[in-house]
Amino acid sequence: MSEENNSQNSNPPNPENGEIASEIQKLQEQAEKFKNDYLYLRAEFENYKRNAIKERSELMKYGGERLVRDLLEVVDNFDRALSVNVSAENFNTFKQGVDMTAQELKSLLQRHNVIEIPAHGAPFDPSVHEALSSEATDQMAPGHIVRVFKKPYKLHDKVIRPGQVVVAKKPE
């Protein structure tokens, strides 16, 4: 009787068991592949983040290199001008050289998108100008700039230095 029970309880070989085992094996291999792909992508992303941080840091550190290189040319011209012994005979030539160097500097700033904002005679704008004082005058409409101590400048669209100005007011 025990043999009968054993033969009844033991499962005969089932073709589905082999298919299930095969399917499990495939799924385990696929899961392992997904895990490896995930780990690879995670490592790639970490490298990307590290490189992006390094690149941004270098951009912050060396971003002004082109401007500085251009400014050094102007500095060289000023150094040459300062090495000249100025006399009455060469004063006009010296002044012309300094004027040319100043123009070169202004041109360089424009090439780097630093633009002077016209101020004299313009209406006072607190987002662009800093009023140092006011002056009673008939020469200029009230609220307009009568004198400029420091010119305002912008870099692209941003004011990087407000102008220091005197604003006209109506005489009393």
Curated annotation (Swiss-Prot):
Keyword Electron transport included in the entry's annotation: no
Keyword presence, Cytoplasm: yes
Comp. bias (Low complexity): 1-11
Major site of localization recorded for this protein: cytoplasm
UniProt subcellular location: Cytoplasm
Role noted for this protein: Participates actively in the response to hyperosmotic and heat shock by preventing the aggregation of stress-denatured proteins, in association with DnaK and GrpE. It is the nucleotide exchange factor for DnaK and may function as a thermosensor. Unfolded proteins bind initially to DnaJ; upon interaction with the DnaJ-bound protein, DnaK hydrolyzes its bound ATP, resulting in the formation of a stable complex. GrpE releases ADP from DnaK; ATP binding to DnaK triggers the release of the substrate protein, thus completing the reaction cycle.
Protein name per its UniProtKB record: Protein GrpE
Organism, scientific name: Bdellovibrio bacteriovorus (strain ATCC 15356 / DSM 50701 / NCIMB 9529 / HD100)
Gene name as annotated: grpE
